[in-house]
Amino acid sequence: MNVNPAGPSPRAVAAACKALSRIDAYPDRESLALVRALARAQGVPEDAIVCGAGASDIIWRLAAAVRPKRIVVCAPTFSEYAEAASYYGACVQEFPLSEADGFDVPASFARAIEGPGDVAYLCNPNNPTGRLVDPRVIDAAACRCEQAGALLVVDECFLGFAPDARERSVAARAACSRHVAVLSAFTKLYGMAGLRLGYLISGNAQLIEGIRRAGQAWPVSSVAEAAGIAALEDVEYVSRTRDVLAGERAWLSHELSSLGLSVVPSDANFLLVRTPAKDIPERLYNQGVLVRTCDSFSVLSRFWCRVAVRTRKENARLAMAFSRALRAEGASGEGEPDERGGASCSGAMAGADGRGSAKEVDTRG
């Protein structure tokens, strides 16, 4: 579970419990109290915010509202962008990231954005790599979208775990732009995965209204709204959580690296780990430890897995399980991983700097 191991703020839990006494009434269609709280927290106008039942809900509603002809995504990245867009007929253009370059997004990503029918997604930090996107890369992509009449969506669901999250957020830019949007949720940092609460910020009034109309009439429950408002107010809890997880992330990364595993440096609450055998996740599972296998991500394989940064006790157990798994005899699937990615439905398009290329894939099957 790559959510805050400390769980939600006690104030958020108390607010949710109190709101249960009002569940006989319909919630506010537009979650105006939450919108006001988000506007204060993010420093953006209220009319630049639309709320939904989690980030995934908004991703699907955006796809339904915009109906893009084509989307541009990094590979690997969160699969929901492509799944939602392809469901509504979009062609998916993948931009492969290189392990040799630390899975960082190169500046040439912007050049894969072509025209008004495009929606480009940047996950910052990226899932599953945990790598932050260089602000200059985001700026180049935003400028390209503004020039081409396209839309850039920056997913900041994991950004709260970064030490300089506020400085790195592009929420302020999105709030005054027709071609940039920021997506975030209360799932990860706030530990509220079960309540389903997310939001999008953009200065594009047509986009905001389209997303609102594309979903159900009451996407946010009164309980989720109350918990979200209280969570935003508990700034100290979030700050303390961020500091603790930063220390645990460094500790776990060191422990896994000392076992000979390749660990991608991360600014999120998870680590991407390269293992020497395909069956390492199975050996971990046999010890009661579950990790996310990454063969479903483009350009990754079964040799890669994503592990959550949790409490010291849980992290120590994970490190010990890895140690035992690596010592186990009879490993299957040894060898170099195949990182060629998914099937291509058109030729590869060379990246501008020669390091990356965009590949068009059809995920509608």
Predicted regions and their residues:
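Short acidic capping loops at alpha-helix termini that bridge into adjacent secondary structure
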Residues: 45-49, 70, 156, 178-179
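Active-site phosphate-binding strand-loop segment of PLP-dependent enzymes
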Residues: 93, 99-163
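Conserved PLP-anchoring active-site segment centered on the Schiff-base-forming lysine
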Residues: 65-86, 98
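PLP-dependent aminotransferase class I/II
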Residues: 10-12, 30, 179-264
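Conserved PLP-binding catalytic core of the aspartate aminotransferase-like
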Residues: 245-246, 255-288
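Short loop-beta-helix segment that forms the pyridoxal 5′-phosphate
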Residues: 27, 39-61, 74
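N-terminal "arm"/small-domain region of PLP-dependent enzymes with the aminotransferase-like
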Residues: 1-26, 40, 116
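PLP-dependent enzyme catalytic core of the Aspartate aminotransferase-like
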Residues: 286-287, 296-365
